[in-house]
Amino acid sequence: MQGEAPRHELMTRFREAEAAVLVGSAGFWEGVDIAGDKLSLVIIDKLPFAPPDDPIFRARSQAMARSGQHAFRELALPQATLALKQGAGRLIRTETDRGLLVICDERLRTRSYGARILSSLPPFRRLESFEEALDFLAED
């Protein structure tokens, strides 16, 4: 689990383990390269929007609003989309890799911007149910 040891040590243990689960935050979305069957499942709990109280994000949003721009559409959404693509990219590193990406955030299905975010992801096969996911993981 992230925080129990330095990142490089956690990554080494994960790579060397026969079967392992690595729990990490967005800090593991960049610089992680685990190709092959060692990484077969990535779970993303929520869309990676910047916190609205982040001082840099707030300053940029305010500056955009003053100039008539829409901060959510032109700043928050593109940033979250790029971050999600980076997170999803941890799963498939080579042409022969396969795995399951689970995004738990309902906003992908309930908000108008959800389709835009999904269309920016690599062309994964989309599954809608737990049963479909189990079937996918059972495939050779």
Regions found by a protein language model. Give the residues of each.
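ASCE RecA-like P-loop NTPase motor cores
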Residues: M1-D140
